[in-house]
Amino acid sequence: MAENASDATTAATNLRLSQAVWETVANDGIEATTVRRVAERAECTTGLLMHHFGTRTAMLAHAREVLYKRTAARANNAENLGLNPRETLFEVLSGTLTLDTERQQEARVWMGFAAAALPDSDIRKLHVSGNRDWLQRITRLVAACELAASPYAAQGFAVRLIALTEGLATLSSLDPETYSADIQRSMLTAEIDSLLGAQHS
């Protein structure tokens, strides 16, 4: 019983620290995500935080991993809805649009890491790896729509769609009135329809 209680306490602490890192990055930005600020949010000592993560870079990398997992889980759920290939492609891609508060927060984290990745090679490697995994997923979904005659062409379509959705997520984070949820959905629908039409014309 004592061991189970200890495990539960450890799990609760890990979750609290993870949430504190995520919320600090999302609300305050990468540059402001210091060990002290995260510790204050987690209501713990800086020593406990550093014992858990080791370094500030590792702490930031954890937040990026959380973003990967959240995005992947949403995409997996979309793929398991039993929709047709085109609808599945739309649902997965719309998971990265800022259609609700949760995804708005994720977009802010993504932008923060994109900026931090420029001068930091470790963060850049992690960021690029995650983005390439996403490109592989979207390329596979595009191919399932029979949009392309070759893997190269399928990837080209995927790059266009990702550029659109990531661009919309960024712009809407800065100007949500102009780039509303309805506008984002409409533009993604139009781009997918354009690709389908171009392939079958």
Question: PLM ranges: what are they?
Answer:
Residues 13, 56, 63, 67, ...:
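Hydrophobic/aromatic residues within well-ordered alpha-helical segments
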Residues 65, 73-106, 154-161:
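Hydrophobic alpha-helical connector segments
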Residues 88, 101-124, 173:
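Amphipathic alpha-helical segments used for helix-helix packing
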Residues 122-128, 132, 144-201:
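Hydrophobic/aromatic-rich alpha-helical bundle segments in the mid-to-C-terminal region
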